[in-house]
């Protein structure tokens, strides 16, 4: 037992030396966690877009249609920049970026409302920036609800024996849960922070592994800086090295970045710490499993580009997981960041407890076990292959 612990300690210390002596690996574990969160947060720093300019094409020209336009202008989401003579004029203004949306009120708008029939209006939005589209749709939905309530109130008050004081429509109030600012950054950055940590250390592990292979090619299949121990001690020592290296970046990502940019932190800090333990272990063993497939240092950057977009999609940030088919859900389940993103959203943004996120928490521990077994098997296989000097004709 003492011998195994000594071997683990030797591998652990040696892996530190390999990481700190590799400029590429240091860039990945320092620059990526330090710079990327700030870059992404600054992109979404404004959080909420207000007063999006729109033009109104009013072919009805009645008090009700004018009231509808005034109600739109009164919302915080949009402002009526001007009235257009017709749709052609409105499209020209959108093309010239004088406005980012068009609201079209047909000539029968007020008549249909007065008859109690379904009234029709049309909206055209610029989709180049999703925040503008969201604001325009939100403003129109809000005004439609308010105007519909006023119409219903007017009908009730015209009854033969109306209730005293009139009848008010059902009041509604929008109460944001978790994401109080309703900002895009507060919605997606907490999940992206977890993905950044994973990518940084996957690339660090791959970079160190590729450097080791290059040393073997230069020395007839022998890595002169490798500690000769068993596969178990090698695996545990390497994993402990990368897990301990993750601690400071994780504190920075999950504590200081949200403070700097006022992202929501409604969860218990101890629940976040408990969540980080299986996540760091899963990322370490996941990286030690994948390191075999990166054989050259030059291949690390393509891996960064390809896997970052792929893992981002599978995590549910850009597309909800329930809308994916079974195959992609299964693939996403194999990625540690997928479960961590879901859990950190619930804990930090919504104030959930770790017990309420037990599915993601248990899934991370399952991945720890799975990737430990797989990485151990891969390491044993690779060690067996290296018993004979590796000769690369290339």
Predicted region positions:
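Extracytoplasmic/periplasmic domains immediately adjacent to an N-terminal transmembrane anchor
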Residues: 1-186, 381-394
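Alpha-helical membrane-protein architecture signal
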Residues: 5, 9-13, 186, 227-240, ...
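Helix-loop interface residues and adjacent transmembrane-helix termini in multi-pass membrane transporters
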Residues: 20, 228, 293-296
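Residues that define the loop-to-transmembrane-helix transition and helix capping
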Residues: 23-24, 232, 298
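Alpha-helical transmembrane segments of multi-pass inner-membrane proteins
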Residues: 24, 28, 32, 186, ...
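Hydrophobic core positions of alpha-helical segments in small-molecule transporters
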Residues: 28-29, 190, 236-237, 300-303
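Hydrophobic alpha-helical transmembrane segments of multi-pass membrane transport proteins
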Residues: 35-38, 175-258
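Membrane-spanning alpha-helical segments of multipass transporters and channels
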Residues: 39, 61, 92, 244, ...
């Amino acid at each position: 037992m003492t011998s195994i612990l000594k071997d683990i300690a030797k591998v652990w210390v040696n892996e530190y030396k390999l990481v700190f002596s590799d400029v590429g690996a240091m860039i990945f574990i320092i620059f990526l966690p330090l710079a990327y969160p700030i870059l992404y947060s600054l992109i979404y720093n404004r959080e909420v877009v207000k007063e999006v300019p729109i033009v109104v094409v009013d072919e009805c020209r009645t008090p009700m249609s004018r009231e509808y336009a005034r109600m739109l202008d009164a919302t915080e989401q949009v402002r009526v920049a001007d009235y257009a003579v017709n749709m052609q004029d409105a499209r020209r203004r959108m093309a010239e970026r004088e406005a980012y949306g068009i609201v079209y009120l047909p000539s029968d708008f007020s008549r249909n409302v007065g008859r109690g029939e379904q009234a029709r209006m049309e909206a055209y939005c610029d989709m180049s920036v999703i925040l503008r589209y969201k604001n325009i749709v939100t403003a129109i939905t809000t005004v439609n609800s308010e105007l519909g309530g006023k119409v219903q109130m007017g009908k009730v008050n015209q009854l033969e024996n109306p209730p005293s004081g009139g009848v008010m429509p059902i009041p509604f109030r929008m109460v944001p849960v978790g994401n109080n600012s309703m900002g895009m950054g507060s919605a997606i950055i907490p999940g992206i922070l977890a993905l950044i940590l994973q990518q940084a250390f996957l690339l660090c592990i791959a970079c160190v592994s590729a450097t080791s292979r290059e040393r073997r090619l230069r020395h007839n299949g022998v890595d002169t800086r490798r500690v000769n121990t068993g596969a178990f001690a090698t695996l545990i020592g390497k994993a402990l090295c990368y897990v301990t290296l993750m601690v400071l970046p994780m504190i920075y990502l999950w504590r200081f970045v949200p403070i700097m940019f006022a992202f929501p932190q409604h969860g218990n800090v101890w629940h976040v710490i408990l969540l980080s333990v299986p996540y760091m272990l899963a990322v370490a063993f996941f990286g030690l499993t994948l390191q075999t497939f990166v054989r050259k240092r030059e291949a690390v950057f393509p891996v960064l580009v390809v896997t970052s977009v792929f893992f981002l999609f599978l995590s549910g940030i850009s597309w909800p997981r329930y809308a994916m088919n079974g195959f992609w859900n299964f693939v996403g389940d194999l990625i540690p960041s997928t479960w961590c993103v879901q859990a950190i959203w619930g804990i930090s943004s919504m104030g959930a407890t770790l017990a309420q996120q037990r599915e993601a928490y248990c899934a991370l521990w399952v991945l720890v076990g799975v990737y430990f077994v797989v990485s151990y098997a891969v390491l044993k296989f690779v060690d067996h292959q290296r018993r004979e000097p590796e000769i690369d004709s290339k």
